[in-house]
Amino acid sequence: MLKRMRDDIKMVFEQDPAARSTLEVITTYAGLHAVWSHLIAHKLYKNRRYVAARMISQLSRFFTGIEIHPGAKIGKRLFIDHGMGVVIGETCTIGDNVTIYQGVTLGGTGKEKGKRHPDIGDNVLIAAGSKILGNIKIESNVNIGANSVVLQSVPSYTTVVGIPGHIVKQEGRRIGKTFDHRNLPDPLYEQIKHLERQLEKAKNGEIQDDYII
């Protein structure tokens, strides 16, 4: 357990340039608190102490804004940055060295029983606001762009953006932008910029107002 906690703290320093000290990370990083609370809740869940497990997970949700079902299986060095609004479903599995930003949902698509949440591989980055839904698999070394909605399985070494999510980079063949979270395309932003360009053309008389969109 202590080794796991040390690894989690190390992951924070590797991923967040704002982290300045171990004391700061331990006392103020809500994502870390949510992950450590989940370790306790998950152990209780595996021992069929479901009510106690849910009580811990709900208490963690109250203090951190991050909801992780105690049944979810989480690998080593999970970094939840900012974290508010993150939801991780009961049958979800997450590999090692995964980074999740605020507003991410790893959820289901209906009221089906059994396996209904996604599996996330190793070394995956899931940017802010993304939704990965259903019994699908996100393989290792994948990047999910901000506000994407992913409904199908994704192969390794790819970058996915958009609604619905589609591959813009695979196996080193760059179609979209770079690996860095800050440079991943934002579909909503791009749509707004497109509308602004169309409005500017309309003002200049290049197109009729009826055909702006």
UniProtKB/Swiss-Prot annotation:
Keyword entries, A-Z: Acyltransferase, Amino-acid biosynthesis, Cysteine biosynthesis, Cytoplasm, Repeat, Transferase
Family matches, as NCBIfam families: cysE, EPS_EpsC
Record InterPro entries: Hexapep, Hexapep_transf_CS, LbH_SAT, Ser_AcTrfase_N_sf, Ser_O-AcTrfase, Serine_acetyltransferase, Trimer_LpxA-like_sf
One Pfam family cited in the UniProt record for this chain: Hexapep
Broad enzyme group: transferase
Pathway field: Amino-acid biosynthesis; L-cysteine biosynthesis; L-cysteine from L-serine: step 1/2
Name of this chain's protein: Serine acetyltransferase
Molecular function in Gene Ontology: serine O-acetyltransferase activity
Keyword Signal annotated: no
Entry's localization field: Cytoplasm
E.C. numbers: 2.3.1.30
